[in-house]
């Protein structure tokens, strides 16, 4: 298992509890070419995108097991696909009875891959843009937890 990130984490370029952490620059991260230079079996590796906000090249979508978290309930509201779903969810909060997040497989088209899991919450608890962000953050964490628990422990 490994994590590739452009973030500054204490664990970078080391292995902690069997998980390897690699620091990459933005150019490497954009193309995911760094994956082919690493010494492990990429075919069995699970790659997750968290706040990636970049288009993954089509050849990488087909070649790797890549999953994305999206803070918009695109199963019910497909108009939330793409950039800034939190703001768009808040802008339409009066028309929605729930908001949520999904984890989906990454394919060539943005946010169009198979939905693996979703988490949602009623909009009756949401009264501001900040509350919308909080609700989507919470549902995102829960969706990722369920997804990873199923993939890693079943």
Task: Report the location of each language-model feature.
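One-carbon transfer enzymes
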Residues: 1-154
